[in-house]
Structures are given as structure tokens and as C-alpha cells.
Amino acid sequence: MKKRYLITLLISIALLSLTGCQSVEKWFKNAKEEWLGLEMTVRTYDENSQLIDQMSGKSLSISRNEEFDSVDAEGNSKEDSSVLKITLGKYEIDHVGSSLIAEEKGLKDVFSQYQKTADVEENSHAVPVLNRMISAFKNEFTGKKKVILIRSQNGTPLAAYAGDRVSLDKSDAPKTSELLIDGKRLVIYRCDYTIYDRELLE
């Protein structure tokens, strides 16, 4: 009985690791960011997409600064702080307001490749509810070939990223999105963005 349980457990672990499950990969990425930090570059931009500042490091982590959370009548945190706490090595930076993009080493801004205005027309018939279900499944398990076009808060083009296995995830900080692009983390704060299936733009 114990042997059968052990074999089942080992097969399950092997299957999970072989499928490249995005959810599992996100969990490991989050754990690595929390305990070791990620090798990342963080850039902030003004409303016209002009670079304000840039910071890079081998041990970088971004989270919501809980000190700025508001509380309800019972004293419970609403977890609504818009202030980001950036840990860069042994230093801390607080950021709020301007657009921010943090890219893990290995990601490449492909803005010049996709800087034209997207004009998409698709005339095939489909079942929207089924498409959403399939897309949600792929987001959790395999990711999809996507292009992310990012704009500043006033709509000025800022950056573009593309990947074969892209999945979108929520962040604990308001106005912040986290993406996993081919195993690398991308954090987008206070930016407009559109995520396209890559085939639509190629």
C-alpha cells in the first residue's frame, strides 16, 4: 500500500513538472522573489512615456506597501495601498504615481517591432464563452503566444513584450498586473495595456 502511494505521488510530481504548468511556475517565481529576489530592471515613466529613473539589481522584489493600507470600521486592513515597496538588495524604495515597468532579466522590449497602431479584423465564427474558458485554462496551465502593448497613463506608447507562453496574474497591489512571459516576470504598474493573441498582429 505504501509503495503504491509513493509511486502515485512520484508520478503526479513528474507530470506536474513535465507539463510546465503556469500556476506551478508562478508559485515558484513568487517564492523565489520573496526569498531570494529576482534579477530585474525597474523603469518609471512620466505621462509622455519619457524615462524618469531606472534601477537594476540581482535581488529585487516588488510588493504593496502595507503601511499605507486603509482600515475599515473594525480595524481590518482593506489591502488597498497604491504605494509599491521595492526591495533592491539591502535597500528599499517606495513608489507611487508614475507608470512603472519591471522586467526580469531575459525579457526584451520589442516595441520597435510592434510600434504601428494595431488594426485587427477577424471574421471567423466562434463561441465567445467557449473561447474564454479555453483562454482561462491556457492562462493557468500552458500560457499562450501573446503580445503585450503598454502605454503611459495618457495613452502614449511605451513598450511591447512578446512570448510563446504568456499568462496574466493579479498582484496584491492595486493598479498592478503581473505577467509570466516564457518563465520571466513582468510587472506593470499604472499603465494602460492591451494583450493580443500574437497571431492577430503577425
Q: What positions do the PLM features span?
A:
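Bacterial N-terminal signal peptides that target proteins for export
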Residues: 1-7
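C-terminal motif of bacterial Sec signal peptides marking the signal peptidase cleavage site
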Residues: 17-20
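Bacterial signal peptide processing site
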Residues: 22-24
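Short, low-complexity, disordered segments immediately C-terminal to signal peptides
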Residues: 26-36
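C-terminal partner/receptor-binding element of secreted or periplasmic proteins
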Residues: 36-38, 78-137, 173-202
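A short beta-strand micro-motif
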Residues: 36-49, 144-154
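Post-signal-peptide N-terminal segment of Sec-exported extracytoplasmic proteins
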Residues: 41-75
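Mature extracytoplasmic domains of secretory-pathway proteins
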Residues: 60-72, 110-174
